[in-house]
Amino acid sequence: MNAATKLPGELGPIHFVGIGGIGMSGIAEVLMTLGYRVQGSDAKASKITDRLVSLGATFFEGQRAQNLGDAGVVVISSAIKKGNPELEEARRRGLPVVRRAEMLAELMRLRSNIAIAGTHGKTTTTTMVATLLDKGGFDPTVINGGVIHAYGSNARAGAGEWMVVEADESDGSFNRLPATIAIVTNIDPEHMEHWGSFDALRKGFYDFVTNIPFYGLAVCCTDHPEVQALVGRVTDRRIVTFGFNAQADVRAINLRYENGTAHFDVALQGEGEGHLIEGMTLPMPGDHNVSNALAAVAVARHLGMKKDEIREALAAFGGVNRRFTKVGEVGGVTIIDDYGHHPVEIAAVLRAARQAVKGRVIAVHQPHRYSRLHTLFDDFCTCFNEADVVAIAEVYAAGETPIAGASRDDLVAGLIAHGHRHARAILCEDDLERLVREQARPGDMVVCLGAGTISVWANNLPARLMGRAA
């Protein structure tokens, strides 16, 4: 590549509008470790912005035109709209305004890349790939959509050749990323406000896979019918498949769970008959998590990692924040915080909870966006079957206006109408505490699900239960 086409070493301060976002902060952190000057603003300070400041960033609380200072370039996410004072000031000055995905793509051009896409499982799979490459001595750079427990951050800058990134399909920008290895975990109808139709989303994933170079690799989960259909349409790129089905190149067999830990073997069918990695363990429950691990195994084998390295790395997997994260245990009741907000994710998490405990499962869900609840209403009414008790909180609007028939009470009524034996509404944290005190017994699990403020409730719950129990 001509050196002139690479990201220059000096750009002036790089200003991020919304630097505290999980997608923006990782890029900012990696840019700083590469020696760039970084500054940015957000509505309020957070653990994420505090970390960036500790690494050398300048942070502005609130968004004002004067925050730009002597910025040389401005980075925005798709959440930043026309009228934002910093965006308008950047345009008034004639500064380059760069979308988040475009800046990520520039960073990726400095490395060989593994990009992880899919409606669900991206963040966990990204973390698993990073974990295995760490163990294999690749020293990867990582930019993720969640905080990796082993790093205490959603990003790290490594000195190695490979970069591992979560590829976000929500606004179509994942097709701008120059992936060398492209992983697709699943494809479900989501983010229709951008794509408009499921066919357009399918085309987006097809483009994501076929954009890889001729020497690249697509790693695809053929347990999912949409991904299997995608594999059938891709005729001129190398593909490795993974899953539980008998045709997968990388296949999980002999799966069982003990105390929330998955034990299984991996048949490397693409390497020939009899190739196995025996005695694999993953310290978290859920068939969906085992499937995600298979994607990481496929990449690790492609890059030449030994079976023992793969086995040891996966056994030590530390997990991702808000992905089946245990936030406490009070009186024998385990409390879990999870980001799941799509019916497919919710059903998978509750199946994992059922595998992890002998007692009952109590699900607490805060729906995220009226539009999602409205579009997928029937799926929401049937995705809580593995929960003995379901409590539904008020919809987290995320800036949307209410939609008739898509409220908290509508969902509770829908759950009951579809046969759930114990569904109810809750209004506040006090209601959640009362529900747990009334329903939970030793050996039970409370699973708080959602992409909004439900995480705060989950993290506060252990102290509330202990404080008032004393």
From Swiss-Prot:
Keywords: ATP-binding, Cell cycle, Cell division, Cell shape, Cell wall biogenesis/degradation, Cytoplasm, Ligase, Nucleotide-binding, Peptidoglycan synthesis. GO terms for cellular component: cytoplasm. It catalyses: UDP-N-acetyl-alpha-D-muramate + L-alanine + ATP = UDP-N-acetyl-alpha-D-muramoyl-L-alanine + ADP + phosphate + H(+). InterPro entries: Mur-like_cat_sf (IPR036565), Mur_ligase_C (IPR004101), Mur_ligase_C_dom_sf (IPR036615), Mur_ligase_cen (IPR013221), Mur_ligase_N (IPR000713), MurCDEF_pg_biosynth (IPR050061), UDP-N-AcMur_Ala_ligase_MurC (IPR005758). GO terms for molecular function: ATP binding; UDP-N-acetylmuramate-L-alanine ligase activity. One of its GO terms (biological process) is peptidoglycan biosynthetic process. NCBIfam families: murC. Belongs to the MurCDEF family. HAMAP family: MurC. This is UDP-N-acetylmuramate--L-alanine ligase. It comes from Cereibacter sphaeroides (strain ATCC 17025 / ATH 2.4.3).
